[in-house]
UniProtKB/Swiss-Prot annotation:
Keywords: Acetylation, DNA damage, DNA repair, Metal-binding, mRNA processing, mRNA splicing, Nucleus, Phosphoprotein, Spliceosome, Transferase, Ubl conjugation pathway, Zinc, Zinc-finger. GO terms for cellular component: nuclear speck; nucleus; U2-type precatalytic spliceosome; U2-type spliceosomal complex. GO terms for molecular function: ubiquitin protein ligase activity; zinc ion binding. It comes from Bos taurus. This is E3 ubiquitin-protein ligase RNF113A.
């Protein structure tokens, strides 16, 4: 290297030093320049000598949770013919996403008794509950019966008893199952639930108040109204539950049903009459309106010219006039108008 280059030597003998810069992480995903392109650029004059085979390089896998793909190594090996027969069989088995292995048995999965002998473990342990304490106490009492007191403390539940409890009408006191206090729950519990949507109310009695079966009818004789659970849930969802409760149980009086003014003239009744649709008018107002149309002034139903005397309203008016003569009038009237004479 220290020798000087003669002018006859070519520039190909000059040695150049290349320093590779450390690549940044950002450039890891960039496409690398294939080596064959550099070789082809150096020997551009000898491009006609032969064909070059370009094989794509395997890219470096970058961990990115947003990019997911299937395994493709087997496909690449098959494409280049580098896959052996053993690897082909392994890839065939791995190509299936889910593989189930049959047990070759017709029995259901799980316990053979389908959980009928499962132990209920939410209560106190069987060896520590009240029934176990009572049974141990009974056993100790049997051992100590007929013996003298040995002055040995055996616990608060194991004091020596000199009188044996007798059976009563409530049951056997020594069995422990009829005593006061907690009773041992069954260990093996299987619940059978039946949803009964039938109200079991006698339909004939509810609609008509009469049933041909009488007291022998097995259904309930009740004429009150009930709502099923799904009806209450629907009202809760729609926001209508309990809105009209006061109106449903409100008892209306007769005075509220009978008006105190004529619907046509808006004045106090003069010879009141009532139609078939239970609307009250003055006799003159009803006849005058009938000349225009035979329909009711309030509900627009056909009256057919039938106007009956309003006996109930006349009795109310007489009652209020009598009360007014005594100094107490509860009938609402205009103060400027005189009492209506009933003819």
């Amino acid at each position: 290297m220290a020798e000087q280059l003669s002018p006859g030597k070519t520039t190909d003998q000059v040695c150049t030093f290349l320093f590779k810069k450390p690549g940044r992480k950002v450039a890891a995903g960039r496409r690398k320049r294939p080596i064959c392109n550099q070789e082809s650029g150096d020997s551009s004059s000898s491009s006609d000598e032969g064909n070059t085979v370009v094989r794509p390089e395997k890219k470096r896998a970058v961990h990115n949770p947003m990019i997911q793909k299937t395994r493709g190594s087997g496909k690449q090996k098959v494409a280049y013919g580098d896959l052996s027969s053993e690897e082909e069989e392994e890839n065939k088995s791995e190509s299936l996403g889910v593989v189930y292995k049959s047990t070759r048995s017709a029995k259901p999965v799980g316990p053979e008794d389908m959980g009928a002998t499962a132990v209920y473990e939410l209560d106190t342990e069987k060896e520590r509950d009240a029934q176990a304490i009572f049974e141990r106490s009974q056993k100790i009492q049997e051992e100590l019966r007929g013996q003298e007191d040995d002055k040995i403390y055996r616990g608060i539940n194991n004091y020596q008893k000199f009188m044996k409890p007798k059976d009563t009408s409530m049951g056997n006191a020594s069995s422990g199952m009829v005593r006061k206090g907690p009773i041992r729950a069954p260990e093996h519990l299987r619940a059978t639930v039946r949803w009964d949507y039938q109200p079991d109310i006698c339909k004939d009695y509810k609609e008509t108040g009469f049933c041909g079966f009488g007291d022998s009818c097995k259904f309930l004789h009740d004429r009150s109204d009930y709502k099923h659970g799904w009806q209450i849930e629907r009202e809760l969802d729609e926001g209508r539950y309990g809105v009209y409760e006061d109106e449903n149980y409100e008892v209306g009086s007769d005075e509220e049903e009978i008006p105190f003014k004529c619907f046509i003239c808006r004045q106090t009744f003069q010879n009141p009459v009532v139609t078939k649709c239970r609307h009250y008018f003055c006799e003159s107002c009803a006849l005058q309106h009938f000349r225009t149309t035979p329909r009711c002034y309030v509900c627009d139903q056909q009256t057919n010219g039938v106007f009956n005397p309003a006996k109930e309203l006349i009795a109310k008016l007489e009652k209020h006039r009598a009360a007014e003569g005594g100094g107490a009038s509860g009938f609402p009237e205009d103060p400027d108008e005189d009492p209506v004479p009933i003819t």
